[in-house]
Swiss-Prot record:
Miscellaneous comment text of the record: Present with 4401 molecules/cell in log phase SD medium.
Ranges of compositional bias, category Basic and acidic residues: 32-53
Region (Disordered): 30-53
Phenotype upon changing residue 122 to P: Abolishes PPIase activity
Assembly information from the UniProt record: Interacts with the RNA polymerase II largest subunit (RPB1) and with the SIN1-RDP3 HDAC subunit SIN3.
Gene Ontology biological process terms in this record: negative regulation of transcription by RNA polymerase II; negative regulation of ubiquitin-dependent protein catabolic process; positive regulation of rDNA heterochromatin formation; positive regulation of RNA polymerase II transcription preinitiation complex assembly; positive regulation of transcription by RNA polymerase II; termination of RNA polymerase II transcription
Name of the protein in question: Peptidyl-prolyl cis-trans isomerase ESS1
Entry's family note: Belongs to the PpiC/parvulin rotamase family.
Disulfide-bonded cysteines: none
Organism per entry: Saccharomyces cerevisiae (strain ATCC 204508 / S288c)
One GO cellular component term: nucleus
A Pfam family: Rotamase
Gene transcribed to yield this protein: ESS1
Organism ancestry: Eukaryota, Fungi, Dikarya, Ascomycota, Saccharomycotina
């Protein structure tokens, strides 16, 4: 009888999917034999595996807008060497930006607002963080990013860095 993981992923027991940071792609690992390989193991239900990878990505690509506040882990940015606004003020400012996105998405693109106001160095790239996998971002940010579908925008997400709004693009 297939294991729960096998029935979800389409992989034969005991195989799992992992992600190679150096090669930037998925690979397959057998924890019993410690064998890893790039190709799907024999006996894989490829349709089920592709559905699983689509529905449960190993990595995502997101844009974000970060507003730091005085209690952020590093209350400084390219915009200000000493950020003094409260967490509530940062949240209120982010709500205003989200409203601007909702009101007229054609003239206020996510990327344009990130360039205009984000406290993250990714502002230069329109808030683009590139592709990342689990364990690479702060847990609250990562959880929100992986729950989004491509094209969706998050509610406000709090992290040690400040308050964010996230858009999944890949």
């Amino acid at each position: 009888m297939p294991s729960d993981v096998a029935s979800r992923t389409g992989l034969p027991t005991p195989w799992t999917v992992r992600y190679s940071k150096s090669k930037k792609r998925e690979y397959f690992f057998n924890p019993e034999t410690k064998h890893s390989q790039w190709e799907e193991p024999e006996g894989t239900n490829k349709d089920q595996l592709h559905k699983h990878l689509r529905d449960h990505p190993v990595r995502v690509r997101c844009l974000h807008i970060l507003i730091k506040h005085k209690d952020s882990r590093r209350p400084a940015s390219h915009r200000s060497e000493n950020i003094t606004i409260s967490k509530q003020d940062a949240t209120d400012e982010l709500k205003t930006l989200i409203t601007r996105l909702d009101d007229d998405s054609k003239t206020n693109s996510f990327e344009a607002l990130a360039k205009e106001r984000s406290d993250c160095s990714s502002y230069k790239r329109g808030g683009d963080l590139g592709w990342f996998g689990r364990g690479e971002m702060q847990p609250s940010f990562e959880d929100a990013a992986f729950q989004l579908k491509v094209g969706e925008v998050s509610d406000i997400v709090e992290s040690g860095s400040g308050v964010h709004v996230i858009k999944r693009v890949g």
